[in-house]
Each structure stands twice: as structure tokens, then as C-alpha cells.
């Protein structure tokens, strides 16, 4: 089946444009916890009618009769795994300034709807009080199947809220940029961790989101940093294919998979089987590495950031865009600083920053500053003054305090209600 997987790898690679990268466009998927005054999860389905009335151009998407999304040409509002979390999707945008303006334009009606319902939209990475239970899960069919196949660890998805940025990439840089951005996962976590409180208490990790999600099929590195760099697109697809196949779509219905995807492909008879490509795309959609290429839209998606403070919500997008724009320079920098020990060194640091944020020692003094410098240079080379959007991250680094550490201070000063007020501040 190795040849069959190589054929899939070639097809996957061909989904990205050939040649040198052109002008990079950007997109953003921002997930927001919505809570009551006491920090317990609100039901975001109550907000959808208000959003629809405020924006008549929004079109409904339903699943099994349930309203699951609203979208127009500017924005998409989508129910997340947890019924207390709403995702706001915008893009493609031509630069970070447009991306942020589009995001704020989309977020404003959400904040107004929440205010009308007496609930709070949080710039925070997890539900702070309500536990992960099946009753919190949005009743979409595929979520039920994933609970069946993964078990209770899947329920962490009902709590978490990430801030994902998409950056367009070319075929020639597909593997190099993906490897580099996966390697830089601890930098994103160090600067953008923001989920230290859930279940109503300090959980002992700056990014409980990354810590808990990392427990999902951890032996195969299904979430977060992969085990190692991939040599080429074929190797990338082979790695994905050795993961468990969790779900399949047949006749418009989602059902549980079984075994690895490579085993499933062999049963189909190889990559030329009518179902093979669509089955692979659904399979790889449910592998949650820090950086993952999205073949349908030709982007690299960066996933390590928790949802950040509302008044600094563009910072993680700027970081992700900078990493992709500067990936070659950053790879050279890491090779010089860490050499052959880069992956094991960064993996150890990843564990440290998940727990301690910017209080964790860097592997090499000045490593984060050097990375930010190269990101800023690459962004400014685009000629649109985007590098200045990294300023919140430089302030965090100078203070050695990321959003998680600030959230813990708010909890200490005012309890859960103080944390809610802090995380709802715009």
C-alpha cells in the first residue's frame, strides 16, 4: 500500500499552487466561550436569531433540523463542539489590517447579541467553570460518532476555544513551512496561552487547552506537535495515514471508522477507489497538529494559540502570519541556535510552556525575541506596516507575563466573576 499512499501524497501536494509563493492572503477562525455572570456556559444557540436579525444577508445552514451556522460573503458564525462556544470565521483578507477589521466587524454583532441576552463573550481559551460532559456537546451527528470512537477525551473539545490563522502557501514550501511552524508550537504557547482556569479553579497549566487536548490519542501525536519533521509530502501523508481512522461518511451519514487509514485504503483497493480521496480528506480533518496544510483552500492553518484578550485579539494571527512569511529565515535561525537537537529541545520546552507560560526558561536566551524580530522583518517586507501588530507580544515578553498569567491574577483578585470581567474586557 506504500505506492497507494504515495499517490495520495502526490495528489495532496498538487492541491497547492506550484512555484514560488505569491502574495499571501489570510483567514481567521476565532472561537469564543460565552458564559453567564458566574462563569457557567451559556447556550450560543440563543444568540443566532439575534445575529440573523442584525444581519439579514446571513444564510442559514441546518443539520438534522438544527440551525448550526449563519454565513454571508463577509463572515460565518458556526456552532462549535461545545454549545457554549461560537466560532467566527473571516477571510480571505489581503493583509493583517484587513483581517483584523473584518474580524472586529464580525465580532461586534456577537458582542451586541450577548449583551442583549445578558451573557459574556470571553477573550479566553476554555470554558472557565462548566465541566466537559456529553450534555455540553452540540448535538451534531459527527460529534456523537467522535465521542463513540475517542471516548471521554473527545469531550475536551466541548470546552476549548482556539484562535486559528490561515496563511496561503505554495507547493514548494508546503512541507518546509509545515515542519517549521510545528516546531515553533512552544513559541506560540509561551506567548498566547490563555486557559489556566477551568472547572472553577487554577488547573496548574497556563494552556490547559493544549495540555488536555494533548491527551487525545497521545501515543500517535494526533494533537499539537507531531513526533518529528516530515521529509516530503509523501512522508506527511504516510504519517497521517498511520493514524486511527475515526469517522467515515457514507450515503450522507457519518459513522465510526476503524483501524488505521492505511488499512482502510487497502480494504478499498487503493487510491483509485471512488471513496479514497474524500475518505482521506475527512480523516485528516480530524488530526489536530499545531500546523496543518489545508488542501481545499491552499493554506497552512496554525492552531496552537488560545483565544486571546479581546483588546489584543489580532496578536496571535500576526504571529502565525509572521512565522509563515519568515519560515526560511526562522529555520536558518533555529538550525544555528539548536542544531540537530531542535526537535527534542523544542518538545521539552513545549511541555514547560504549556505549564508555566513565559515563566518557563527559553532553551537559548533571547530565542523568542529573535523569532519575533524575524517575523516582524518578514511582515514589514510586505510593505503594509503589519509588523507593528506584534507589539502586544513584545510587551508580554518584556513583562514575562502572557494572558494566562494575567488571568490567574484576575482570579486571585476577584474570583470567577473577576476572571469573567477580565476576559470580557474589550
Model regions and ranges:
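Short, catalytically relevant binding-site loops at active-site mouths
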Residues: 307-309
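Solvent-exposed residues in well-ordered beta-strands and their adjoining turns
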Residues: 35, 91, 168-170, 305
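Loop-rich catalytic cores of soluble enzymes, especially ATP-dependent carboxylate-amine ligases
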Residues: 125-295
Amino acid at each position: 500500500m506504500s505506492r497507494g499512499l504515495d499517490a495520495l501524497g502526490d495528489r495532496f501536494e498538487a492541491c497547492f499552487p506550484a512555484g514560488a509563493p505569491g502574495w499571501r492572503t489570510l483567514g481567521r477562525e476565532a472561537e469564543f466561550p460565552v458564559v453567564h455572570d458566574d462563569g457557567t456556559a451559556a447556550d450560543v444557540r440563543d444568540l443566532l436569531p439575534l445575529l440573523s436579525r442584525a444581519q439579514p444577508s446571513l444564510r442559514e445552514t441546518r443539520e438534522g433540523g438544527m440551525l448550526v451556522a449563519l454565513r454571508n460573503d463577509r463572515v460565518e458564525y458556526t456552532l462549535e463542539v461545545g454549545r457554549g462556544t461560537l466560532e467566527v470565521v473571516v477571510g480571505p483578507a489581503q493583509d493583517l489590517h484587513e483581517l483584523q477589521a473584518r474580524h472586529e466587524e464580525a465580532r461586534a454583532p456577537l458582542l451586541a447579541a450577548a449583551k442583549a441576552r445578558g451573557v459574556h463573550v470571553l477573550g479566553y481559551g476554555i470554558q472557565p467553570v462548566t465541566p466537559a460532559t456529553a450534555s455540553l456537546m452540540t448535538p451534531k451527528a459527527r460529534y456523537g460518532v467522535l465521542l463513540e470512537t475517542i471516548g471521554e477525551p473527545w469531550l475536551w473539545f466541548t470546552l476549548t476555544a482556539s484562535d486559528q490563522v490561515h496563511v496561503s502557501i505554495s507547493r514548494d514550501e508546503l512541507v518546509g513551512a509545515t515542519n517549521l511552524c510545528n516546531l515553533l508550537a512552544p513559541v506560540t504557547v509561551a506567548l498566547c496561552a490563555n486557559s489556566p482556569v477551568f472547572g472553577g479553579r487554577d488547573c496548574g497549566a497556563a494552556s490547559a487547552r493544549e495540555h488536555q487536548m494533548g491527551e487525545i490519542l497521545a501515543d500517535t501525536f494526533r494533537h499539537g506537535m507531531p513526533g518529528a519533521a516530515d521529509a516530503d509530502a509523501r512522508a506527511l501523508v504516510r504519517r497521517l495515514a498511520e493514524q486511527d481512522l475515526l469517522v467515515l461518511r457514507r450515503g450522507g451519514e457519518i459513522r465510526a471508522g476503524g483501524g488505521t487509514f492505511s488499512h482502510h485504503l487497502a480494504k478499498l483497493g487503493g487510491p483509485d477507489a471512488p471513496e479514497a480521496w474524500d475518505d482521506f480528506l475527512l480523516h485528516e480533518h480530524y488530526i489536530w497538529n499545531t500546523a496543518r496544510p489545508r488542501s481545499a483552500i491552499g493554506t497552512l492553518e496554525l492552531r496552537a494559540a488560545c483565544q486571546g484578550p479581546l483588546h489584543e485579539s489580532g496578536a496571535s494571527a500576526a504571529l502565525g502570519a509572521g512565522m509563515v512569511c519568515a519560515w526560511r529565515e526562522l529555520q536558518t535561525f533555529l538550525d544555528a541556535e539548536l542544531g540537530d537537537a531542535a526537535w527534542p529541545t523544542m518538545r521539552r520546552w513545549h511541555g514547560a510552556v504549556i505549564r508555566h507560560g513565559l515563566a518557563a526558561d527559553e532553551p537559548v536566551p533571547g530565542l523568542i525575541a529573535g523569532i519575533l524580530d524575524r517575523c516582524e522583518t518578514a511582515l514589514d517586507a510586505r510593505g503594509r506596516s503589519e509588523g507593528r501588530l506584534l507589539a502586544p507580544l513584545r510587551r508580554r515578553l518584556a513583562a514575562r507575563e502572557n494572558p494566562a498569567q494575567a488571568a490567574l491574577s484576575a482570579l486571585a483578585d476577584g474570583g470567577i466573576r473577576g476572571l469573567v470581567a477580565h476576559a470580557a474586557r474589550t
